[in-house]
């Protein structure tokens, strides 16, 4: 009996050592549904702080299919033969990363095969070129020819920038703009000579909707759902009005401003509900194949100022209106 017991101990120890060796050999881990930074750090025998440091995480928020480093040195932007790779930090957006590297958010989406605007801390993104220094930015700003573009209904700064192969920040600089507001008939300076012929689709949103574009200052209360959605729309070049007041008034106010309101979610649209005392709005980051949607929001499941993500099941999507 004692001999069998010793054999069992040896066998168990060997299996544990094998599992430990396998875990230590791994350098990355793909997050599965239900996992947390605690469970992953425990699996690989590292601390939560180490795991977050390796991946540039500033919170415990992780996503299914996110690839995390579990060994090696802390992540940084690196240059490879195929271009520069940037590690997303908390608070980054495609627009802010594009501005940093002197490219467009559309180009970054194309380089990385993205079909929506959702990015997360620790994610690796290919970017075109290298980070622009201040001296280089000044040099590029003082040279080159410009042309004049007449704004059409449904245009946005991002759409025009994409049409002319530039950035919306460059167009704002050329025209002395301090916000995203443009209007039909307005004349804008744009870099280069003529635009490409394929321009009609760029004036529409993902769902084919025409949307007015405002360039207001964000006057919504800091950290509220309305404040967050205003900023997310501005980031994708589809600025909204700062005068729609509480979330339960956004459907009527946006309709009065000419926006399309329906029950069909699209990436970049605003999910709106009158439920609760003030109502609620969220930004649609992704529309899933099963009819559910992923939204980003504030002041829903966390304190004001803390952005969270939530998947709204398909059967609940019908409870929301969508502002395009």
Curated annotation (Swiss-Prot):
EC number: 3.5.1.28
Occurrences of domain LysM (ranges): 27-70, 84-127, 147-190
Lineage: superkingdom: Bacteria
Name of the top EC class for this enzyme: hydrolase
Positions of the Peptidase C51 domain: 200-324
Main location: secreted
GO CC annotations, alphabetized: cell surface; extracellular region
SUPFAM superfamilies: Cysteine proteinases, LysM domain
Keywords: Antimicrobial, Bacteriolytic enzyme, Cell cycle, Cell division, Cell wall biogenesis/degradation, Hydrolase, Repeat, Secreted, Septation, Signal, Virulence
A biological process term (GO) from this entry: defense response to bacterium
Catalysed reactions, as listed in the record: Hydrolyzes the link between N-acetylmuramoyl residues and L-amino acid residues in certain cell-wall glycopeptides
CDD domains per record: LysM
Compartment list: Secreted; Cell surface
One Pfam family in the UniProt entry: LysM
Signal peptide (from-to): 1-25
Single Gene Ontology MF annotation: N-acetylmuramoyl-L-alanine amidase activity
Task performed by this protein: Peptidoglycan hydrolase involved in the splitting of the septum during cell division.
PANTHER family noted in UniProt: LYSM DOMAIN-CONTAINING GPI-ANCHORED PROTEIN 2, MEMBRANE-BOUND LYTIC MUREIN TRANSGLYCOSYLASE D
Protein name according to UniProt: N-acetylmuramoyl-L-alanine amidase sle1
